[in-house]
């Protein structure tokens, strides 16, 4: 993926190509754009060496545990949550990232079902029933795995109210910009405009 693309990029003569991997740059940018204050502070604390990384924190917040108790495998679940759900991804996005990171979805489902609240499981089961009623795809997942992914999605969104509001506001502003060419619509630090 990234390494494959890097091999296609060559610096021009006299220039140097520098490769860098910025720690959770997607999450940092999104937290800043959305004004997700608790998360911005968590990044600051992580950078200062006084708090856990955000992948551990994502898992801990969803499974009602402490970041210190999060194992390497559990951190991977947190990573998938952060990367797959941050830009309005749902179960399908979670599934895609889980495949990339070779997660065992049955193990994931077991972890979720053994720790999630009855209310969270019931809400996710309700969403699954709605998806089936509307004849939408369940992506070949078992009901148990689908519900687990839905629980994680809902938990992530509950923990990120400013990010969810940003999605809604950007969507509305894009539609307004399309309907009103030449007019600029602002959402926090973003300016959305269609010309022509």
Give, region by region, the residue ranges found by the protein language model.
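Conserved catalytic core of nucleotide polymerization and phosphodiester-bond processing enzymes
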Residues: 1-196
